[in-house]
Amino acid sequence: PMMSLRFAATRSMAARSFSSTTVASSLDRMQTVETYNAVLEKFAQIRACAVLRTATSEACPKAMGAAIDGGFKIVEFTLTTPDCLTHVADFRAKYDGDVMVGCGTILTIADAEAAVDAGSEFIITPVMLPDVIQWCAERNIVSVPGCQTPTELVNAYRHGAPLQKLFPGVTGGPGWVKAVSSALPFLSINPTSGVDLDNAGDFLRMGAASVGLVAPLFDPEAIANEDFDQVAKNAAKVMANVREVGPYVRKA
């Protein structure tokens, strides 16, 4: 039978560490199950996230705005970008209901709290951090932890992460994703770094649930030259590639 990402979320939620709904409902920053599922549904439909880190605060909204103009509907601001949380809040206010906004390079629960307070709709970490995953899972917040091995991917899933970020994705490429997703079909793998303007669709066809686009989308030279039209063109190329594959549905 076929299993959608929404059903996978239900399975992941069932594996969470908390058992008392009374305790869970009293937690700070608690989100609804409907919100949690809506985030996962957006990932399943759109399947590509624009991941931005810039050296200056000024370049950040221009670059991300260009990616959105090119068709991206899921975006991630990294904490390494100056004024990251301000940009999260601004874009959430400007695009709420159309573009889903998240925060990356989260390393601590305090980072996650600040990101959620700014309006982040999902949390992404560069490495597998069980405490952050569990904090998010207890609050119906989607986390996408960075993993490098099949063992880390499975452990992230067991801790409550409904999506697992393969970072860096360049290490194994689409063939690696195919092998791992075939052996472990309950995983929802999100390769990031190593995904470019041409191979995004290949990763998805080989079993990735979604992909993250970093430097190939946000070309450093284009940003340095303030050529944001080029960023928009890059975005349009990627999204056309991704749309050819269609929404995410996988076998149980």
Locate predicted features.
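N-terminal mitochondrial targeting presequence
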Residues: 1-30
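Conserved N-terminal beta1-alpha1 strand-loop-helix module at the mouth
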Residues: 15, 26-112, 116-118, 138, ...
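Catalytic beta/alpha-barrel core
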Residues: 51-53, 74-81, 98-107, 120-129, ...
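Short acidic active-site motifs
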Residues: 59, 87, 110-111, 131-132, ...
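Glycine-enriched alpha-helix->loop->beta-strand junction motifs that scaffold or abut catalytic
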Residues: 68-73, 95-98, 116-123, 138-144, ...
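Catalytic cores of alpha/beta
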Residues: 108-118, 151-159, 195-210
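Glycine-rich phosphate-binding active-site loops on the catalytic face of alpha/beta enzymes
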Residues: 126-132, 166-174, 208-228
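Anionic-ligand binding region
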Residues: 150-162, 174-183
